[in-house]
From Swiss-Prot:
Residues 5-151 form the UBC core domain. The gene is UBC36. This is Ubiquitin-conjugating enzyme E2 36. The active site is at C89 (glycyl thioester intermediate). Partly functionally redundant with UBC35.
């Protein structure tokens, strides 16, 4: 770990992520930049994303922990709170961020969002409309996208 200029907090959080990974989540720092993490989240059971492996990138800005990490999905996903660029609509990544939160909390919250899509606070209007007008069909589309784009990522 080339961590010469990293704040202690980032080093400690990284060590904990590696030694005690959260169930269904792996996050490993890049060799070149310890503020950049390659993340994999398994689709939660009993969700439309079950069986999927979703790749994300997480970046800790210079201001971290005073500013939230930047996180986005690299794997295509059909979800009302995630747009086609992989950006995530999650309160703790925006106005509800607190320095008391950690990388682990953020990743667990994203995993929970996969279990409980919220079409009332959408990032993708079209998917949210689909979810609200015909949830069963939207869930089927999400399952199909999971099979197409997230199987064995």
């Amino acid at each position: 770990m080339a961590n010469s200029n990293l704040p202690r907090r980032i080093i400690k959080e990284t060590q904990r992520l590696l030694s005690e990974p959260a169930p269904g989540i792996s996050a490993s720092p890049s060799e070149e930049n310890m503020r950049y993490f390659n993340v994999m989240i398994l689709g939660p059971t009993q969700s439309p994303y079950e069986g999927g492996v979703f790749k994300l990138e997480l970046f800790l800005p210079e201001e971290y922990p005073m500013a939230a990490p930047k996180v986005r999905f690299l794997t295509k996903i059909y979800h009302p709170n995630i747009d086609k660029l992989g950006r995530i609509c999650l309160d703790i990544l925006k106005d509800k961020w607190s320095p008391a939160l950690q990388i682990r909390t953020v990743l667990l919250s994203i995993q929970a969002l996969l279990s409980a899509p919220n079409p009332d606070d959408p990032l993708s209007e079209n998917i949210a409309k689909h979810w609200k007008s015909n949830e069963a069909e939207a869930v089927e589309t999400a399952k199909e996208w999971t099979r197409l784009y997230a199987s064995g990522a």
